[in-house]
Amino acid sequence: MTSRNYLLLTPGPLTTSRTVKEAMLFDSCTWDDDYNIGVVEQIRQQLTELATASEGYTSVLLQGSGSYAVEAVLGSALGPQDKVLIVSNGAYGARMVEMAGLMGIAHHAYDCGEVARPDVQAIDAILNADPTISHIAMVHSETTTGMLNPIDEVGALAHRYGKTYIVDAMSSFGGIPMDIAALHIDYLISSANKCIQGVPGFAFVIAREQKLAACKGRSRSLSLDLYAQWRCMEDNHGKWRFTSPTHTVLAFAQALKELAKEGGVAARHQRYQQNQRSLVAGMRALGFNTLLDDELHSPIITAFYSPEDPQYRFSEFYRRLKEQGFVIYPGKVSQSDCFRIGNIGEVYAADITALLTAIRTAMYWTK
């Protein structure tokens, strides 16, 4: 373990501000109104307001990583007679398919491949051919490749066919402007340690209240019962059913203040976009190629092909960058040798410039 503070160029956990870290220096009692009403309830309200100005939505916080909340939604929103169409083009869509299988949830997996944008016409055809499908689930920002998926077009299909729409917006909510009511999203899932720039420890769901109220008695899990967690927070003014991750919650409350101070989601999106564009331009100038075409990229993380030089080893490249204070991500695409660089968190233009200089220095195979 080291005390050195690296710049994390990952899709989360990510580099957080000093003030977000300092917010965790306070110990809270989970029974206190100062915490439950003064912090948790304020967070719930702010999340709902970030998601939409429309009435009829609520939010619920859930201990654990983002995957816990995805599993909670799938396990609570779908009844025994329901069936979900899961749109998958990466590891996180595939994880939803795995969850559905383990829970015995009827599902149709539409896997369009890791580097392909989901075909909206193909989704339309699946819905038209199978009226037993009641729900659609998909990932917005698929960090396996850095692809941004067409949740607006699929949302229009969900609305037209009258399907419940579940969106994993883990690596996009708070960093990409969206109105979940306009997108016809019934359940949006995200996490504390992504674009809002908090630390790991809990995830959250912003849901259409009418849909969430109908989940009573459906959950396939005690601790991942989304309805029960929501009712506990509603009835007890922010109280969690089981131990609340108090320090993470305090950090998140501070992160929300810093999001507002930056200028909100639109301003943060602009910074992320500029980071990503500068990164791609600089990497191409160094001879690297992106896995995806530019029009498919999200402003969150970018996958680059590994150099073809036989001397290149990711582990050595990674080590040399880490020595200079930068941490990047290995590849996750099964069919391509690549690595990934994220640009969310407390990362600014000067950091991208410094990273590119460090990468040039770390390119030992060109020496």
Swiss-Prot record:
Top-level taxon of origin: Bacteria
Keyword set, alphabetical order: Aminotransferase, Pyridoxal phosphate, Pyruvate, Transferase
Molecular-function GO term, any one: 2-aminoethylphosphonate-pyruvate transaminase activity
BP GO annotations: organic phosphonate catabolic process
E.C. number: 2.6.1.37
Residue positions, PTM N6-(pyridoxal phosphate)lysine: 194
Co-factor(s): pyridoxal 5'-phosphate
The keyword Transferase appears for this protein: yes
Enzyme's top EC category: transferase
Keyword Acetylation listed: no
Catalytic activity: (2-aminoethyl)phosphonate + pyruvate = phosphonoacetaldehyde + L-alanine
Pfam families linked to this entry: Aminotran_5
Protein role: Involved in phosphonate degradation.
Protein family membership: Belongs to the class-V pyridoxal-phosphate-dependent aminotransferase family. PhnW subfamily.
Subunit structure: Homodimer.
Listed name of the protein: 2-aminoethylphosphonate--pyruvate transaminase
Organism of origin: Salmonella paratyphi B (strain ATCC BAA-1250 / SPB7)
Phylogenetic classification of the source organism: Bacteria, Pseudomonadati, Pseudomonadota, Gammaproteobacteria, Enterobacterales
